[in-house]
């Protein structure tokens, strides 16, 4: 079929297999161009491996370090009449490239929050991998089913304490309006922590430790975004911020529970990028449009793959990692530089519907958003008839 983007609000409901493959290939080539990472991991588990920072982590582990990788994700394959999800096509492209490069790689599609996923992953690790020396936890999910009680928790994106009003860009109509987000209830905060906090990260590490599949000195990392003044009320001082604070708690708990194996657990603070998760957050499309304009102008703009290569070389596998006082790796330092933030704040005050395309980089934002789903990628023929049903071998 000929596949053109179908966008509804902040979601694109289809994906292009060849565009997704080209994106993955570009990230692989960027990583290879950086050269081999010294003292990198050998056996890596990536929980949430199909898009964004999780996918980039897996690419750096495999193509930057030569590691075996086991990737978990929750994606839909294509059929003859319907496209699969972008994440499915990303993993299929990664798998093909890994095989071509002679890298061991296996994939699991399912609910990473379940006990079943954990035991299945452990079986694969025991049978085929050797002990794990890096666990990447990179899940972005709106819901989580408690594996014991069966209760389903849902996350919300709301400020904490008081309502928050800010300008917001409707990415369909290009209208800029004031949007008010009501404050979250205690119950909504608790549910968001259950979904997006550190509990499942702990459960993964406990299950892996109990099965004795973690190497001595294994590292584990989970990702967060903190942001600055503009995004703080909807990120840092909001339900999502409360959940991310719980990641800090979990990191400390993991390191202390498994100290006999010298396990290190850190949260890594990464920069704002366009992902399927961030495009759903009010304020972020407009903030990102301003941020890209400023960072591109001063030559510091980075996407997921640039960020992850730096996380590995400057933090995870560095003798002098960049840590803050909460023991978090920081790779957001370019975004948070006073110069960049001042530039973004100035633009934020000036942006209107009339000058949006002129003074911000909304076009760049849009291009990145469509690119997530494999559209608008250089070198891809979008008039070509393509098969949406792409093969990918999965762990049964």
From Swiss-Prot:
One of its GO terms (molecular function) is enoyl-[acyl-carrier-protein] reductase (NADH) activity. Substrate binds at residue 225. Keywords: Fatty acid biosynthesis, Fatty acid metabolism, Lipid biosynthesis, Lipid metabolism, NAD, Oxidoreductase. Pathway: Lipid metabolism; fatty acid biosynthesis. One of its GO terms (biological process) is fatty acid biosynthetic process. The active site is at 235 (proton donor). NAD(+) binds at residues 48-53, 74-75, 111-112, 139-140, 244, 273-275. The record marks 75 as: Plays an important role in discriminating NADH against NADPH. HAMAP family: FabV_reductase (MF_01838). This is Enoyl-[acyl-carrier-protein] reductase [NADH]. It comes from Teredinibacter turnerae (strain ATCC 39867 / T7901).
């Amino acid at each position: 079929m000929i596949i053109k983007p179908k966008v509804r609000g902040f979601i694109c409901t289809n994906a292009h297999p060849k565009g997704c493959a080209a994106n993955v290939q570009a990230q692989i080539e960027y990583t290879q161009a950086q050269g081999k990472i010294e003292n990198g991991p050998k056996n890596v588990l990536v929980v949430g491996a199909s898009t964004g920072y999780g996918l980039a982590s897996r690419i750096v582990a495999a193509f930057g370090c030569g590691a075996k990788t086991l990737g978990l994700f929750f994606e839909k394959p294509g059929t003859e009449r319907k496209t699969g999800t972008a994440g499915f096509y990303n993993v299929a492209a990664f798998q093909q490239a890994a095989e071509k490069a002679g890298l061991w790689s296996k994939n699991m599609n399912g609910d990473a929050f379940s006990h079943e996923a954990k035991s299945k992953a452990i079986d694969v690790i025991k049978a085929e991998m050797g002990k794990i020396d890096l666990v990447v936890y990179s899940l972005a999910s709106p819901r989580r089913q408690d594996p014991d009680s069966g209760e389903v928790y849902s996350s919300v994106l709301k400020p904490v304490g008081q309502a928050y009003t800010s300008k917001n860009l409707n990415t369909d109509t290009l209208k800029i309006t004031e949007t008010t987000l009501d404050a979250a209830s205690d119950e909504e905060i608790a549910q968001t922590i259950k979904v997006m906090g550190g509990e499942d990260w702990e459960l993964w590490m406990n299950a892996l430790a109990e099965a004795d599949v973690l190497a001595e000195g294994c590292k584990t990392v989970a990702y967060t975004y903190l942001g600055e003044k503009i995004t703080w009320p909807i990120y840092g001082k909001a339900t999502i911020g409360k959940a991310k604070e719980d990641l800090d708690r979990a990191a400390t708990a993991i390191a202390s529970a498994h100290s006999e194996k010298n396990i290190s657990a850190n949260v890594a603070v990464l920069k704002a990028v366009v992902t399927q998760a961030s495009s759903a957050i009010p304020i972020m499309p407009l903030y990102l449009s301003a941020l890209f304009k400023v960072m591109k102008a001063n030559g510091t703009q980075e996407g997921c793959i640039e960020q992850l290569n730096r996380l590995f070389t400057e933090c995870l596998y560095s003798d002098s990692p960049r840590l803050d006082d909460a023991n978090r790796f920081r790779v957001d330092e370019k975004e948070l530089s006073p110069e960049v933030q001042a530039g973004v704040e100035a633009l934020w005050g000036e942006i209107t519907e009339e000058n949006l395309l002129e003074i911000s980089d909304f076009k760049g934002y849009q291009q990145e958003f469509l690119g997530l789903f494999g559209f608008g990628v250089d070198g891809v023929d979008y008039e070509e008839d393509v098969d949406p049903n792409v093969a990918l071998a999965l762990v049964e």
